[in-house]
UniProtKB/Swiss-Prot annotation:
InterPro entries: Rbsml_bL25/Gln-tRNA_synth_N, Ribosomal_bL25/Gln-tRNA_synth, Ribosomal_bL25_short, Ribosomal_L25_dom, Ribosomal_uL5_bac-type. This is one of the proteins that binds to the 5S RNA in the ribosome where it forms part of the central protuberance. This is Large ribosomal subunit protein bL25. The keyword Ribosomal protein applies. Part of the 50S ribosomal subunit; part of the 5S rRNA/L5/L18/L25 subcomplex. Contacts the 5S rRNA. Binds to the 5S rRNA independently of L5 and L18. Pfam families: Ribosomal_L25p. The lineage of its organism: Bacteria, Pseudomonadati, Pseudomonadota, Gammaproteobacteria, Moraxellales. One of its GO terms (cellular component) is cytosolic large ribosomal subunit. GO terms for molecular function: 5S rRNA binding; structural constituent of ribosome. Keywords: Ribonucleoprotein, Ribosomal protein, RNA-binding, rRNA-binding. PANTHER family: RIBOSOMAL PROTEIN L25/GLN-TRNA SYNTHETASE, ANTI-CODON-BINDING DOMAIN-CONTAINING PROTEIN (PTHR33284), RIBOSOMAL PROTEIN L25_GLN-TRNA SYNTHETASE, ANTI-CODON-BINDING DOMAIN-CONTAINING PROTEIN (PTHR33284:SF1).
């Protein structure tokens, strides 16, 4: 069972792209994507503080994580994490379905 549970919100197509991602980051949100398996990729938004708290544990990178998107739960593993070069805060995360 997953030790980490993150709450996410699905992003509409008009909330995707460079400008929209910058606006999300200013609101302390992190854009992310969930892909893999037989399902279509899903663009989501995570809370920065919630993601940073999970990243404090090295186990987060090795175990399956549950992401709740609305009423659906996705079991995923982190595939890639992009950080700000100076601040070291997460800028974008890629999750692959487990």
């Amino acid at each position: 069972m997953a030790n980490f549970v993150l709450n996410a919100q699905a992003r509409a197509e008009d909330k995707q792209g460079k400008g929209a991602s910058r606006r999300l980051r200013r609101e302390s949100l992190v854009p992310a994507i969930i892909y893999g398996g037989n399902a279509e990729p899903v663009a989501v938004t995570l809370e920065l503080r919630e993601l940073v708290k999970a990243l404090e544990s090295n186990v987060f990178f090795e175990e399956v994580v549950e992401i709740k998107v609305g009423d659906k739960v996705e079991n995923v593993k982190i595939q890639a994490l992009q950080r700000h070069p100076a601040k070291n805060t997460p800028m974008h995360a890629d999750f692959k379905r487990a």
